[in-house]
Amino acid sequence: MNYKLNKSAAIISQTTNDYDHTVGYHDISPFNKNNDNILTMHRFPLKNTDLSNNIKAEICLWHSRESIIEKIDETDSWSWEQGSRLQWLNCEEIIYNIKKNKKNKSCIYNINNKQKKILESPIYSLSQKNKKFLYINYSRIRHFWKNYGYEFTDKIEFERQPANDGVYLSDFDNNQKLVLSIEKAIDICGLKKSNQYFFIAHPTFSPKGDKFVSLLRFINESGILISYFICTDLNKDTHTLLAREKVSHFEWVDNDTIVVWCRNLSPKYEKIRFNKYLEKYFVSSIKKILKLLKPGIQQKLISTHYHMIKLDNPYKLIKLNENNLTEDGHPQVSKNGRFLITDTYANKIGYQKLLLYDLIKNKTHFVGEFKVDSYLKNKNLKYDLHPRWNHNSNKISIDSSHDGSRQSYIIDIQELINTIS
């Protein structure tokens, strides 16, 4: 069996298997706010495993009830993990990244009148509240972290700690400004003495759009990704370091609360990661031993869990239900704020779990598990479920390869929610 579902959940729609179809990352809902039947979608040649942008991603609308996938454009600004950052701007318009004249830009497309508007900057995170968006240097991301950036044709020499690169804020009239430079982020994190090549990833607006969080990252001498989690208040022009060293996926619960998978250790441990000899001989040996243990035991030993961070007391990390949420995943909070949906990475036999966490009752419920197809595993390519809510908080969109190719699915969990509420 290549998948299993909770008896109170049901797959109600899936994309056609004549192409690969994928939504993208876990932080964007593909559902139209006024019509659950219309979802944003990327389309690729069937069983594509080429991570280069030589193959264009088709920008599509999935009319799920009618099983119709409508192509509206194509782009070569896409990544394996996140697509083109395709998302709804409002109920009539979508926005996605494109490349024009060798520069990364974004395009607004009106689904009613078919008109396009080209913006001078690419998009990462959108705030519908204040009609602004954040973006980053996708070429720098691609250079240091291949699965998340976009190909670039010109040879670029990157600085280690640039003052003129980082997170940018833009409106839809092309007014742009740098709101967090890589140099500033390095200073915030106390890393000015480091000689690493840094980059900033995942800048994400708070629900009200007055704050954003981002990850300052670098890859150390052992090939380990090191991360620092920063919150920027745009109104106050302040920055707060929230977590360090091991920080993975996160989600805003409300405008002042964040859930994040991270390690909660003292800064003393951080110094080990900057000592190349201790890192090479001590930490690497410990990691080999940990890999032999079950995920839950691993997390207890290395203090890595889902934590809640409240911005009014950011230095007190509140651990979530560790007995059931013992693995890193891709969380998204329901629109009504009651539930968190997340996944896990594939286990040793290739299955990824889909889990529903009740934020009020502090309890986790099994939704399903799905097997990564062998053609991806054989090429050492992961394909995450990246679960995403609809706007009524009763359906989930996932990407999965359990049927033999990359496809998207809609799972109705209303009955499951009714039984646990």
Model-predicted segments: where are they?
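Surface-exposed loop and turn segments in beta-propeller and other repeat-based domains
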Residues: 12-21, 72-80, 176-196, 318-324, ...
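Blade-terminus and WD-like Trp-Asp/Gly-His loop motifs, strongest in beta-propeller folds
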Residues: 28-38, 78-101, 124-132, 136-137, ...
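Asp-box/WD-like beta-propeller blade repeats and closely related beta-sheet repeat scaffolds
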Residues: 75-87, 91-166, 179-195
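Loop/turn-rich, solvent-exposed surfaces of beta-rich toroidal or solenoidal domains
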Residues: 291-306, 318-363
